[in-house]
Every structure is written in structure tokens, then in C-alpha cells.
């Protein structure tokens, strides 16, 4: 199981190169991708959750209970933001160390990816050119039919559709043929890349010393991350206590008020 975790970590780190396999822009670091995703995800949850709380407080029941959930939500959001800022340097250090420890393996895998990319690129360029040629040919064949449609009456619509149908089918068949040709050209290189990756990890697994070393370093980094995260998590717990207590008091007060009104009736 530890080997699987380590393998996934290495794949994730090499993903900063693999995700740009067909692209020309500079790759984003693993930490930047994780940080961006986490920030967007947490902010989305926080914003949507706040909207629900605001809607509830604006309702008749929310006004009657007067739980002040929105104040508690904002306080809770501030606490989470503080904890996230505290954990930022810790998780950054963890990713930096993990990247450093797997540098050699990632370089080998990136080299394999680049080699396959160079072999496949001519087929991709040829496919793109053929695709554009087919679309241009189709556009030229469509031009006179479009003029005929604009000049013709409604009763000619059916006739125009009958003329367009063979052209569309011809384009579809030709594009399918190009896609199939590309698939056949690229398939051997995809299989080769898959075999290379499998061989890399098999060699890592069979080399007991290397694998044990990677596992030990990964465990050490995870342990260090856990130790450094403890203060921030404790701050989170302390920040949650007054929020939960305030919410508890508000709910009990609302229940008590409701009970008194029922008894008075």
C-alpha cells in the first residue's frame, strides 16, 4: 500500500510535465496546482454555504429563531482562513521535499514523455492539417448551396436538405478515417510509453533498497508534516469552540422561548 501511495505521488509530481505533453506553455508546479484547486474549492463551499445561511436567516423561521448563524459563519470562515495561512508554509515545505526526493525518477519519466512526444508530433501536425483541409473543402462545397437557399423559396428547403445530407455524410466519413489513421499511428507509441512507465515502477519495486529508501523518506516527510500541522489544528479547535458554544446558546434560547409560548397558549 505504501508503494502505491509513493507511486501516485511520483505520478502527481511528474504530472506537472505530462499535463503539458501537447502544450507549449510553461508547466505549473504541483504545489501551485494543489493550492489553486484547494483555494477555489474551499472558497466555493464557503461562499455557497454563506448564501444558504443568509437565505435561512432571511426566512420567517430564521427571523423568529434569531440564531445569528451568519455572524457565526463569518467567524468560522475567518478561523479557517487563519488556519489555511498557517498551514501554507508547512505544506509548501512538504511538497518541496517530496519533489527533491523524487527528482531523479521524475527526470527519467519526463525524458520518456518528451521522446514519445517528438515521435508523435508529426502525426498530430499531419492530422491537424488534413482536418483543416477537409473543413475548407466542405465550406467551399456548401457556399453555392447557401446562395441557392437564400435565393430559393421555402419549398426548396427539402431539396436543399437532400443535397446537404450527402456532403455531411462524406465529411463525417472522411474525418472518421483521419481519426482512425491517427489512432493507428499513435497507438504503438502510446503502448511504448505505457510499457516504459511500467518498467520504471517495476524496477523501483524490485530494487528493494531504492523503494525502501523512497518509502522511508516519504514517511518521514508525512510525519514532519503532521507534527508541524498540530499547532494550526489546535488553533482551529480553539476557534471553533466559541462559535459552537454561541450556536448552542442561541438554539437553547430559541427552544426555551418556543416552549414558553406553547405553555402560555
Swiss-Prot record:
<dbReference type="GO" id="GO:0034362">
    <property type="term" value="C:low-density lipoprotein particle"/>
</dbReference>
<feature type="repeat" description="8">
    <location>
        <begin position="210"/>
        <end position="230"/>
    </location>
</feature>
<dbReference type="InterPro" id="IPR000074">
    <property type="entry name" value="ApoA_E"/>
</dbReference>
<feature type="repeat" description="3; half-length">
    <location>
        <begin position="111"/>
        <end position="121"/>
    </location>
</feature>
<dbReference type="GO" id="GO:0005543">
    <property type="term" value="F:phospholipid binding"/>
</dbReference>
<keyword id="KW-0597">Phosphoprotein</keyword>
<dbReference type="InterPro" id="IPR050163">
    <property type="entry name" value="Apolipoprotein_A1/A4/E"/>
</dbReference>
<keyword id="KW-0445">Lipid transport</keyword>
<keyword id="KW-0325">Glycoprotein</keyword>
<dbReference type="GO" id="GO:0010875">
    <property type="term" value="P:positive regulation of cholesterol efflux"/>
</dbReference>
<feature type="repeat" description="7">
    <location>
        <begin position="188"/>
        <end position="209"/>
    </location>
</feature>
<keyword id="KW-1207">Sterol metabolism</keyword>
<feature type="region of interest" description="10 X approximate tandem repeats">
    <location>
        <begin position="67"/>
        <end position="265"/>
    </location>
</feature>
<keyword id="KW-0964">Secreted</keyword>
<dbReference type="GO" id="GO:1903561">
    <property type="term" value="C:extracellular vesicle"/>
</dbReference>
<dbReference type="GO" id="GO:0050821">
    <property type="term" value="P:protein stabilization"/>
</dbReference>
<keyword id="KW-0443">Lipid metabolism</keyword>
<keyword id="KW-0753">Steroid metabolism</keyword>
<feature type="signal peptide">
    <location>
        <begin position="1"/>
        <end position="18"/>
    </location>
</feature>
<feature type="repeat" description="2">
    <location>
        <begin position="89"/>
        <end position="110"/>
    </location>
</feature>
<protein>
    <recommendedName>
        <fullName>Apolipoprotein A-I</fullName>
    </recommendedName>
</protein>
<dbReference type="GO" id="GO:0050766">
    <property type="term" value="P:positive regulation of phagocytosis"/>
</dbReference>
<keyword id="KW-0449">Lipoprotein</keyword>
<dbReference type="GO" id="GO:0005615">
    <property type="term" value="C:extracellular space"/>
</dbReference>
<dbReference type="GO" id="GO:1902995">
    <property type="term" value="P:positive regulation of phospholipid efflux"/>
</dbReference>
<dbReference type="Pfam" id="PF01442">
    <property type="entry name" value="Apolipoprotein"/>
</dbReference>
<dbReference type="GO" id="GO:0034364">
    <property type="term" value="C:high-density lipoprotein particle"/>
</dbReference>
<feature type="repeat" description="9; half-length">
    <location>
        <begin position="231"/>
        <end position="241"/>
    </location>
</feature>
<keyword id="KW-0153">Cholesterol metabolism</keyword>
<feature type="repeat" description="6">
    <location>
        <begin position="166"/>
        <end position="187"/>
    </location>
</feature>
<dbReference type="GO" id="GO:0042803">
    <property type="term" value="F:protein homodimerization activity"/>
</dbReference>
<feature type="repeat" description="5">
    <location>
        <begin position="144"/>
        <end position="165"/>
    </location>
</feature>
<dbReference type="GO" id="GO:0018158">
    <property type="term" value="P:protein oxidation"/>
</dbReference>
<dbReference type="GO" id="GO:0060228">
    <property type="term" value="F:phosphatidylcholine-sterol O-acyltransferase activator activity"/>
</dbReference>
<feature type="repeat" description="1">
    <location>
        <begin position="67"/>
        <end position="88"/>
    </location>
</feature>
<comment type="function">
    <text>Participates in the reverse transport of cholesterol from tissues to the liver for excretion by promoting cholesterol efflux from tissues and by acting as a cofactor for the lecithin cholesterol acyltransferase (LCAT). As part of the SPAP complex, activates spermatozoa motility.</text>
</comment>
<dbReference type="GO" id="GO:0033700">
    <property type="term" value="P:phospholipid efflux"/>
</dbReference>
<keyword id="KW-0813">Transport</keyword>
<dbReference type="GO" id="GO:0042627">
    <property type="term" value="C:chylomicron"/>
</dbReference>
<keyword id="KW-0345">HDL</keyword>
<dbReference type="GO" id="GO:0033344">
    <property type="term" value="P:cholesterol efflux"/>
</dbReference>
<comment type="subunit">
    <text>Homodimer. Interacts with APOA1BP and CLU. Component of a sperm activating protein complex (SPAP), consisting of APOA1, an immunoglobulin heavy chain, an immunoglobulin light chain and albumin. Interacts with NDRG1. Interacts with SCGB3A2. Interacts with NAXE and YJEFN3.</text>
</comment>
